[in-house]
From Swiss-Prot:
It comes from the Bacteria. Pfam families: Lactamase_B_3. Keywords: Hydrolase. HAMAP family: UPF0173. One of its GO terms (molecular function) is hydrolase activity. Belongs to the UPF0173 family. InterPro entries: Metallo-B-lactamas (IPR001279), RibonucZ/Hydroxyglut_hydro (IPR036866), UPF0173 (IPR022877), UPF0173_UPF0282_UlaG_hydrolase (IPR050114). CDD domains: metallo-hydrolase-like_MBL-fold. This is UPF0173 metal-dependent hydrolase BCAN_B0597. It comes from Brucella canis (strain ATCC 23365 / NCTC 10854 / RM-666). The keyword Ribonucleoprotein does not apply.
Length: 237
């Protein structure tokens, strides 16, 4: 399995049977400078969304139309995407598991919000925010936390799914900050590797992963992959 951070909370996940984009905010993403957008979306089969904010839904509609990708999202967000012309949708909700070729995806809790502005400038709620747990046939289990704070039921997520790789928001202000994110990883999970995200993009959130790296320093069993956007990491089952 190969995982590429595309800046902010966007990732490309490649396995033998699927190419999945998670929260594909590319155009307008300050953290995606230098990213080859065509390369990032090449061969995409699925798009998975954690929640309905513009910096996570991003380019979903355009990518889904161009590539015929199936979009996986909470039911309310999926309905809205259908109204925007997305044809291949697989809706779910918190606690639900969806099966696709080569992987399953489970919607788990996240502490955040989920809404988009309408043309009239009114905020439209788009279901609950989620984290997403991916179980693959031939690759380690992956947990993208979405946008969230720490919460004690992370212990249940670990008990149920035993994720080996974590994608963790660390930028503060709209999610937990680096020190709290490190606490979440150490207290509730046994990750082999973690990829921090939701930082080094907008100026009002943290610009570096320094606080997270410092918080993880006394937990050497977990490898912190705080590399520049565009870096490709490979993982074996």
């Amino acid at each position: 399995m190969k995982i590429t951070w595309l800046g902010h909370a966007a990732f490309r996940v490649e396995t033998a049977k699927a190419v999945i984009l998670i929260d594909p905010f590319l155009n307008g993403n300050p953290g995606a400078k230098g990213i080859d957008f065509k390369g990032a979306t090449r061969g995409v089969t699925h798009i998975a969304l954690t929640h309905g904010h513009g910096d996570h839904v991003g380019d979903t509609v355009a990518i889904a139309r161009e590539h015929g990708a199936t979009v996986i999202a909470n039911a309310d967000l999926a309905s809205w995407l259908g109204s925007q012309g997305v044809e291949k949708l697989d809706p779910g909700n918190t606690g639900g598991t969806l099966a696709h070729e080569g992987f399953t995806i489970t919607f788990v809790n996240a502490l955040h919000s989920s809404a988009m502005l309408t043309e009239n400038g009114v905020s439209q709620a788009l279901g609950n925010p989620n984290g997403l747990v991916f179980h693959f046939e031939d690759s380690p289990t992956l947990y993208h936390m979405g946008d969230t704070d720490i919460f004690s039921d992370m212990a249940l997520i670990n008990e149920l799914h035993q994720p080996e790789i974590g994608i963790v928001p660390i930028g503060d202000r709209f999610t937990m900050g680096g020190a709290v994110a490190a606490l979440a990883c150490q207290r509730y999970f046994n990750f082999n590797s973690v990829l921090p995200c939701h930082y080094a993009s907008f100026p009002i959130i943290d610009r570096t992963a320094d606080k997270f790296i410092a918080g993880m320093a006394d937990h050497p069993a977990t490898k912190v992959l705080a590399d520049p956007a565009g870096t490709v990491h490979s993982f074996q089952a």
